[in-house]
């Protein structure tokens, strides 16, 4: 197996072999059932091209997928999470503030699947739209998340990952927090303008 990190905290990735690039899937602190279902439904197709590191959320592990070469699942990763971000060539994530700041800081090509308005205050949708507008991310709305959409989007973003990284690098001299704040203000202003029409 492939091991990552110092010996005392090394994380094992059984069956991970090159040259398949790693995808990191983060469902959120409590897991994201729809995201997990879509990953599992597409797992055979994903593993033809990628290794998959899947953070499923507490109580969301599916034992039937244990031991699949190129796939490893965890309920949660703590201190090693930055290492997983660094390892991944592509990240699939919810669009919480912590996650998007990490993606921007590490310049990681990513797909954001924000919590729907039915399940949140809508802040993740705002985060995701802001990042997509700046060319940092590709967004799949939860209502649009089908097996086909996920697989085609993964392939599209991976093949064009340099474009997303270049967009982040273009703005690297600007402070990340102020840049995100500016993005939010722009999107909010556009929303208000649309509603005023």
How would you describe each model-predicted region?
Residues 1-11:
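Active-site-proximal region of nucleotide-activated glycan assembly enzymes
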Residues 9, 13-91, 125-128, 140-148:
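Donor-nucleotide binding loops and adjacent catalytic segments primarily
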Residues 86-101, 108-109:
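Acidic donor-binding loop of glycosyltransferase active sites
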Residues 93, 109-121:
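Short hydrophobic beta-strand element within catalytic cores of glycosyltransferases
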Residues 107, 125-137:
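Acidic, glycine-centered active-site loop in nucleotide-sugar glycosyltransferases
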Residues 136-162:
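C-terminal "capping" alpha-helix adjacent to the active site of nucleotide-linked donor transferases
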Residues 162-174:
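A short, well-ordered alpha-helix in the C-terminal region of glycosyltransferases
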Residues 173-197:
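C-terminal alpha-helical cap of glycosyltransferases
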